[in-house]
Design a protein with these regions (language model features):
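Gly/Ser-rich "nucleophile elbow"/oxyanion-hole loop immediately N-terminal to the catalytic nucleophile
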Residues: 116-164
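Short beta-strand element of the alpha/beta-hydrolase
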Residues: 68-76
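N-terminal secretory signal peptides
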Residues: 1-16
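C-terminal catalytic histidine-bearing segment of alpha/beta-hydrolase fold enzymes
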Residues: 241-287
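Short beta-strand/loop motif that positions the catalytic acidic residue
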Residues: 213, 219-221
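Primarily recognizes the serine-hydrolase "nucleophile elbow" in alpha/beta-hydrolase
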Residues: 144-206
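N-terminal export leaders
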Residues: 16-30
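N-terminal cap/lid segment of alpha/beta-hydrolase-fold proteins
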Residues: 35-63
Length: 287
């Protein structure tokens, strides 16, 4: 759940620290030549036709000839912005065709926040919540179908391989919905600090959609979300077992928002651990 008690209030500019640069250099040195050759990425701003209009989005894929599995990335409550473009580039460099949509296209063009945005400012926060409220369940399902169809229309997409979807904050719940909306296509779901919206008492709770899916799940929860609703992880595990869906549910030692660079609670160590788990998920299931 994204609220003033959980979500990081300060959105900071993302700059590469010396420590981060050193880590990236060390990782690059350990990669095989084939992985380094794939590090060049093609990036495009695209428009995706949906049932409700046209969504502005960012598309990424490896440079050169070839075809790769499709991945849909749902951003957090603050939408498509540089931090998620960075994420799209990184995924594409690992060998995927990646679409990062503006989830709020019905209300505003991305980016929907500026450099001065402060989540602690009630007026600014309520504006984002208003954008989210404009997204109905049916609308989200239709969007997910349109996004996967768009990915499959790209010549770089390996259509014979399964697709993945990952989401952050509110995007966790949207990823669950995507897996249910396109069950024959989505084989892997990653939810990162998805908050307490994954299990609710409502009839449209995302966890109730699990039996309609054919995916393997990775659910990485924030420690402060878990403190608010400690039973949720057990409810999720039970739902996965009942639906016979493979899943990993883990509470990370970091707060809500820890995976997204540029936020006050970004935790590099735990973010990299979550990314490694995501990489393993995709390598095993997008085949």
């Amino acid at each position: 759940m994204c609220d003033e008690f959980i979500h990081p209030g300060l959105v900071e500019d993302h700059r590469l620290s010396r420590r981060s640069f050193g880590l990236m250099t060390a990782v690059a040195a350990s990669l095989p030549a084939s992985a380094l050759a794939q590090s060049e990425v093609v990036e495009k701003d695209v428009e995706v036709k949906t049932a409700d209009g046209v969504c502005d989005a960012a598309l990424f894929h490896p440079a050169g000839k070839g075809s790769w599995p499709a991945v849909l990335v749902w951003p957090d409550i603050m939408g498509l912005r540089p931090a998620f473009r960075d994420m799209g580039r990184r995924l594409a460099a690992q060998g995927y065709v990646v679409l990062v949509p503006n989830p709020f296209y019905r209300s505003a063009h991305a980016p929907v926040i500026g450099e001065s945005f402060d989540f602690n400012n009630q007026e600014q926060r309520n504006r984002l919540f208003g954008y989210r409220s404009a997204m109905t369940d049916a609308g989200i399902d239709h969007d997910a179908q349109a996004y996967l169809a768009f990915l499959d229309s790209q010549p770089e997409t390996a259509k014979t391989k399964k697709a993945g979807v990952q989401g952050y904050c509110m995007g966790g719940a949207l990823s669950f919905r995507t897996a249910a909306a396109v069950p024959a296509r989505v084989a892997a779901v990653g939810s990162f600090h998805g908050g307490n919206g994954l299990v609710t008492k409502e009839a449209n709770s995302p966890h109730l959609l699990i039996p309609k899916t054919s995916a393997t799940y990775l659910v990485c929860q924030a420690q402060n979300d878990d403190m608010q609703q400690p039973q949720m992880k057990d409810d999720l595990k039970a739902a996965f077992v009942a639906a016979k869906r493979p899943a990993t549910v883990e509470v990370y030692q970091a707060n809500h928002g820890w995976c997204v660079k540029g936020g006050a609670v970004y935790n590099e160590g735990e973010a990299e651990r979550a990314w490694a788990a995501l990489t393993k998920l995709y390598q095993s299931n997008l085949v």
